[in-house]
Amino acid sequence: MIVTVTPNPALDITYGVPALRPHTSHRVASVHEQAGGKGVNVARVLHGLGRRTTAVLPLGGSTGAVLRADLDRAGIACLGVPLAAGTSTRRTVAVVDAVDATVLNEPGPELSAEDWTALRAAVRGLLPTARALVLSGSLPPGLPGDAYADLVRLAHDQGVPVVLDADGAALTGALAAGPTAVKPNAVELRRATGIADPLRAAHALVDAGARAVVASLGPDGLLAVTPDGDWRARLPPEAVVRGNPTGAGDAAVAALAAALADRTPWPAALAHAVALSAAAVQAPYAGRFDPQAYRGHLPLVRVTPATPPAGSAPSD
């Protein structure tokens, strides 16, 4: 079983429009609602891959009830931690046109110390039967800054590998605990390190405690610093992928978690992450992927050793 933890889940609302133009009125062509948040999206992708998964998340109010009902309908196991009365799960809105997506994120509800204790206990109770743990997304107000570090240590005590996908202090505050892999995007990587070159920045995160870093670089694929070497993985330039990119990173995390659970070698793990991420872009909503596209992309992915720019060292 792969356990996903989403401390700040959301009800994802997606509006489809022909073309998004700021400062004008739009006629919405389609509306879709589903349980979301980064870890929930990861669980949905894992479920689509046929992997057994349990999504752990705090749920509150009528919005939280909608999330739970959606996960139940999808057949995804959910361990929901109930929040106090009057506390409601947030919403996100994605406006998607033929070219790109614009996403609006509500702030999460403030969690109490009791909420955190219950969430931590829920995760701890699942670890003895877990093969991998995924920690995804922002920490809502009220959670301690070292919440992810605490969960990483709990997992390591049980011999469970951890994939962390977070930004800012939620990422940097967990590095010393030694997550098995962290998956920032290019912006998050630079923000965490202050280093412009992605390879040097990834090495800096390893120096800070991460055991591996897999950075998503958009159309340039993935850059990875791992115990087995430094790698770049991407589709060939002629394999143009267009669609909704909002769930691409979560699909990559799902592939990495599955690979860690199976102890897959890093080059193969990265190939699956690139192929699954591209297939997610071709699906209409986050947490989904096109299975045929996934199978078609996989043999096209090129995984090659990564080398630093001429004249630079791999890390500071």
Task: Please provide the spans of the model-predicted regions.
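Structural motif
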Residues: 1-3, 102, 131-132, 212
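Glycine-rich phosphate/adenosyl-contacting loop at the front of the ribokinase-like
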Residues: 1-56, 65-66, 239-241, 307-316
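Hydrophobic anchor at the start of a short beta-strand
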Residues: 2, 51-54, 78, 162, ...
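Short, conserved phosphate/pyrophosphate- and ester-handling motifs at nucleotide-, phospho-/glycolipid
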Residues: 46, 185, 249
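Conserved N-terminal subdomain of the carbohydrate kinase-like
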Residues: 48-131, 296-316
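Short beta-strands and strand-loop turn motifs
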Residues: 103-105, 130-138, 165, 183-186
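Conserved phosphate/ATP/ADP-binding segment of small-molecule kinases
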Residues: 146-231
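Conserved phosphate-binding/catalytic region of the ribokinase-like
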Residues: 172, 198-316
